[in-house]
Amino acid sequence: MNHCLLAISAVYFKAKWLTPFEKEFTSDYPFYVSPTEMVDVSMMSMYGELFNHASVKESFGNFSIIELPYVGDTSMMVILPDKIDGLESIEQNLTDTNFKKWCNSLDAMFIDVHIPKFKVTGSYNLVDTLVKSGLTEVFGSTGDYSNMCNLDVSVDAMIHKTYIDVNEEYTEAAAATCALVSDCASTITNEFCVDHPFIYVIRHVDGKILFVGRYCSPTTNC
């Protein structure tokens, strides 16, 4: 008799923004899922805050990147293509080397930020992906698990489940943040409006990538 060994990996991330979004500034806003189609999303907004930002020009496309820090040692990097349908070419070139280069180009500036509230859940079988990457000896009848147990077992599925919830998560410290905005009212600000598909990368301060995903529409995880 063959006994099936099911390997399960789960990722959960939730953290408070270092500079929280005020719920009173959240409102419905058009989000372009394609150049010809848009839907309304709950768009979070903050004004005149200081964030690391860069406008990047590459042969495969131009985009903007911003770092939104969390309390603690993590931050979310948002990569927004200049073109509404420019996400795929950036994804294809999202290598470790390129990502580090883009992060090194960041400069602090005052920015008005608009980004959707979103929840992303997913469940994926990683077997095909891992086999394509060369990890073939652990799956099916070729796997040798004699050091783990005396049964005839095989790994037939590797399920990866994800969940991320991005919302305002503001605290009492938000009042002090508002004071900073008024102090800097005369400062020239830029705008980072996430109104079409984007990539988000959650990373640790030491550079380790904790989570990578994309948001294409409020109705699908794409």
Swiss-Prot record:
Q: SUPFAM superfamilies given for it?
A: Serpins
* Classification via PROSITE patterns: SERPIN
Pfam families in the cross-refs: Serpin
A single GO cellular-component term from the record reads: extracellular space
InterPro entries under this entry?
Serpin_CS, Serpin_dom, Serpin_fam, Serpin_sf, Serpin_sf_1, Serpin_sf_2
The molecular function terms in GO held by this entry are: serine-type endopeptidase inhibitor activity
Describe the family membership recorded for this protein in Swiss-Prot or TrEMBL.
Belongs to the serpin family. Poxviruses subfamily.
Protein name as it appears in the record: Putative serine proteinase inhibitor 2 homolog second part
Q: Which organism is it from?
A: Vaccinia virus (strain Copenhagen) (VACV)
